[in-house]
Amino acid sequence: MVIARGLLRSNASSSSSQAINLLKYVTSTGSLQGHTQNLCDASTRHFSSVPSPQYNSTEENGFKGHGMLAPFTAGWQSTDVHPLVIERSEGSYVYDIDGKKYLDSLAGLWCTALGGSEPRLVKAATEQLHKLPFYHSFWNRTTKPSLDLAKELLSMFTAREMGKVFFTNSGSEANDSQVKLVWYYNNALGRPDKKKFIARSKSYHGSTLISASLSGLPALHQKFDLPAPFVLHTDCPHYWRFHLPGETEEEFATRLANNLEELILKEGPETIAAFIAEPVMGAGGVIPPPKTYFEKVQAIVKKYDILFIADEVITAFGRLGTMFGSDMYNIKPDLVSMAKALSSAYVPIGAIMVSPEISDVIHSQSNKLGSFAHGFTYSGHPVACAVAIEALKIYQERNIPDHVKQISPRFQEGVKAFAGSPIVGEIRGVGLILGTEFADNKSPNDPFPAEWGVGAIFGAECQKRGMLVRVAGDNIMMSPPLIMTPDEVEELVSIYGDALKATEERVAELKSKKNN
């Protein structure tokens, strides 16, 4: 039996219909043989349940009904179908428990930048575990790895001078902590009314209470009583989807900047604390900014004394062909969030960098109050920091951003060569991050029927051919390891093309049935 997981839509019937249709499709292809297979690729840093074909379990009883409350997964999936269980990784590939090999085109969850088998990172973790497996950073006690990592991060970030680094365990925690730091800063300056944060529609900043509130994806808010009332959302800078007829990219950027200013004036500049943005929006569909967008937005927030937070959780450490996304788009942030590639995801760690102006105020305020009363048990965990230090060395020694510049043109051009497909609305990206959006008639206003599950069909076809992609509705996202070889890029492009052709054929069948 094959069970497909439906996409999270506005109502349950849509999801059920889509799952049933996809189930019929995959069964009809004859590609899934033998034991139970399923279609369930968890969608993290985005919020739809995404089908993709999975494995023939060699386990007699499989893993149905396992004990995890699985993130971004519908309850029935855990009960009724087997998860895809990944057992090992090697370079740009992962292997399931049956030994099937997959090209990991999303680098886990945008994070295994150095691939799955970098011995230097394993060695760094092992040596630190033997030497000092844990010590905290409270009360002016800390460890050498945490001090060394903070120093290295401050020297690596060159978009502007930064003052201090605060360590977290994830990007969600980093963005959550940003809100506390900004409030602490403004309270210290006697500006207690500066509490509101402006984020963008379709943004993703995490899944904690505050970071999910900052995120502009409705599925993160539903039934969680979110977003928090101090969070506002402004326009998503997706030119293809939202530009007006005849409007150029620069005109579009100007309109969005004007809308942002109108929102600030409506709420009162004295109430707005910060604006947060990803240099390239990730889980919202891989959306690079339109020309001059960040130039205009930075001018607006600076005009009204509003802090700029750069969420570099996905874009830091070479993803775009620059060490940080801020370098590519000339962003001069007051605060920066990072995680994921910071340790190539080998050990959980995140970090915040704050400007000297902010760190000086925090320093002064903590002296008045007796301490800076924020932190986590694992802030600056020595093993995580040791691995991150080694990862940063590799990024610099191997000049990973330059490697990305060398291979990304073929990655981008190879996939974008399929933009003429009748089922593709847009293919967009920069560096080693890319998104495909399926649409009828090349129009953002003509989505395919949700129950067809076009994105899910494509994901299933990719996985059948040995490649894992991220599916979110009719959006496909890829963000492969930064160490990809030219041959692996060719493999990715080839599988993409074959999967697209099969998806086109299936869509043609669905259209024919609809018209008959």
Swiss-Prot record:
The molecular function terms in GO held by this entry are: 4-aminobutyrate:pyruvate transaminase activity; adenosylmethionine-8-amino-7-oxononanoate transaminase activity; pyridoxal phosphate binding
| SUPFAM superfamilies referenced in this protein's UniProt entry, alphabetically | PLP-dependent transferases (SSF53383)
Per its UniProt record, what CDD domains does this chain match?
OAT_like
Q: Describe, from its UniProt entry, the tissues in which this protein is expressed.
A: Expressed in roots, stems and panicles.
- UniProt entry keywords in alphabetical sequence: Aminotransferase, Mitochondrion, Pyridoxal phosphate, Transferase, Transit peptide
Q: What does the record note about activity as a function of pH?
A: Optimum pH is 8.0.
Role:
Transaminase that degrades gamma-amino butyric acid (GABA) and uses pyruvate as amino-group acceptor, but not 2-oxoglutarate. Not involved in the interaction with blast fungus.
What protein name is recorded for this chain? Gamma-aminobutyrate transaminase 1, mitochondrial
Q: Which organism is it from?
A: Oryza sativa subsp. japonica
